[in-house]
Amino acid sequence: MKKLRRWFKSTSNRTFIVWPIVLFAVEAIQGGMPRLNLWALPLLPWGYLQYHWVGAYRTKLGGGGPGLSNPPERIVEAGIYRWMRNPMYLGHIVFFVGLALVLESWLAAAVLAFHLVWFDLRARGDEKHLAQLFGDPYRDYCKRVKRWIPFVY
């Protein structure tokens, strides 16, 4: 039971496995097999691969693990981190956008809206933690690099 609880606690397991199963099941129960918009399907592997590749990249350059439960040893400012501070979370968001578009579902859109807010709040909390960990060098990085959209936000 402890392993299962830990598995469900993983944000990536919930994003890439649990939510798609739940949303497909709810859509199927409500009205049979949902009509899928296949043109949006590439967003699903894009979001998944972005999360995993950026996580491996950050771990390679910064040490630690892909999440803050095993925090980095160094600030990573190279690659995609030169343009945005939270590309791993953005991978989750791209996946949820893809899921909402593929399913063309109000429920999937509501799940996306919830996660837009949730990941923004989580990123802000992570950034406070990293500022405590790395001090002024991290605060300077935050002044130079936007949270989500390069040069904008």
Spans of features found by a protein language model:
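Membrane-anchoring alpha-helices and their flanking helix-loop junctions
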Residues: 1-81, 90-153
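Extended, alpha-helix-rich binding/interface surfaces that flank or overlap catalytic cores
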Residues: 86
